[in-house]
């Protein structure tokens, strides 16, 4: 298995990488659709729709397809998004849970003094509470949401911002994610990238996006990142 040396910073996606959040996202999206008298959505559908941020998720729910309806009414879209945000917040994210090995692996990187960040397309307002709720907020020096900057993944803007802030060369940063947006962002930033097979990638294998390494379990990251003694 390939091993990365000289890694000084690790950036993580959130949904589908650290956290299985589909049940809560699907519930909020379904409630929003019901409130508007639209067709309901299922967990199975939402699993293939997430990864591009809440606006796109709700657009897909309204369109009942991964392809957005080009004639979708803007006012309806905005109302649906506001309802989704309300229901998602009111639900308290109680059905979401960390994947196996996440907390232990993050703790190991933290113990090895490797700074870490969250780079997610999820709206930033929801991220701090989720990290605190699952006891991992202390591990991250930066938390970047999908609306923190004007551009989100697959654009590399957030990764470039982190490299500039922490004075990193691209070869010193590692991105960990479960979708092609994560892989494309890392490749555009020319940093290393690991793709995880268990997350949400629009129903496609993550290997198709050609990450440097493909892993089936989060805990395997310890085997590919060479930690200082």
From Swiss-Prot:
Q: What is its EC number?
A: 3.1.3.18
| Cofactor (UniProt) | Mg(2+)
One GO MF annotation is: phosphoglycolate phosphatase activity
InterPro entries from the xrefs?
HAD-like_hydrolase_sf (IPR050155), HAD-like_sf (IPR036412), HAD-SF_hydro_IA (IPR006439), HAD_2 (IPR041492), HAD_sf (IPR023214), PGP-like_dom2 (IPR023198), PGPase_prok (IPR037512)
Q: Which domain of life is it from?
A: Bacteria
- Keyword annotations of the record: Carbohydrate metabolism, Hydrolase, Magnesium, Metal-binding
Q: Which residues bind Mg(2+)?
A: 13, 15, 178
> What reaction is this protein's catalytic activity?
2-phosphoglycolate + H2O = glycolate + phosphate
The active site annotation covers: 13
Pathway assignment reads: Organic acid metabolism; glycolate biosynthesis; glycolate from 2-phosphoglycolate: step 1/1
Name a single GO biological process. DNA repair
Query: Which major enzyme category is it?
Result: hydrolase
GO annotations of cellular component type: cytosol
Family matches, as PANTHER family? PHOSPHOGLYCOLATE PHOSPHATASE
Function per UniProt: Specifically catalyzes the dephosphorylation of 2-phosphoglycolate. Is involved in the dissimilation of the intracellular 2-phosphoglycolate formed during the DNA repair of 3'-phosphoglycolate ends, a major class of DNA lesions induced by oxidative stress.
Task: Please state which protein family the record places this protein in.
Answer: Belongs to the HAD-like hydrolase superfamily. CbbY/CbbZ/Gph/YieH family.
Write the protein's name. Phosphoglycolate phosphatase
**UniProt organism field:** Photobacterium profundum (strain SS9)
């Amino acid at each position: 298995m390939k091993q990365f040396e000289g890694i000084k910073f690790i950036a993580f996606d959130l949904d589908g990488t650290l956290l299985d959040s589909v049940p809560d996202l699907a519930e909020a999206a379904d409630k929003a659709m019901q409130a508007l008298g639209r067709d309901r959505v299922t967990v199975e559908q939402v699993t293939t729709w997430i990864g591009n941020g809440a606006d796109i998720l709700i657009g897909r729910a309204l369109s009942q397809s991964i392809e957005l309806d080009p004639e979708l009414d803007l006012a309806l879209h905005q109302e649906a998004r506001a309802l989704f945000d309300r229901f998602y917040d009111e639900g308290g994210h109680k059905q979401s849970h960390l994947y196996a090995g996440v907390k232990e692996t993050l703790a190991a990187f933290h113990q090895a003094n490797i700074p870490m960040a969250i780079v997610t397309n999820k709206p930033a307002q929801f991220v701090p509470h989720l990290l605190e709720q699952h006891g991992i907020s202390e591990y991250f020096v930066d938390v970047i949401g999908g609306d923190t900057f004007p551009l989100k993944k697959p654009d590399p803007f957030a990764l470039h911002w982190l490299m500039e802030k922490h004075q990193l060369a691209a070869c010193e940063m590692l991105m960990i994610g479960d979708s092609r947006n994560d892989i494309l962002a890392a490749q555009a930033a020319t940093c290393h990238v690991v793709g995880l097979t268990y997350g949400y990638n629009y129903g496609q294998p993550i290997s198709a996006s050609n990450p440097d390494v493909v892993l089936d379990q989060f805990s395997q990251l310890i085997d590919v990142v060479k930690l200082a003694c």
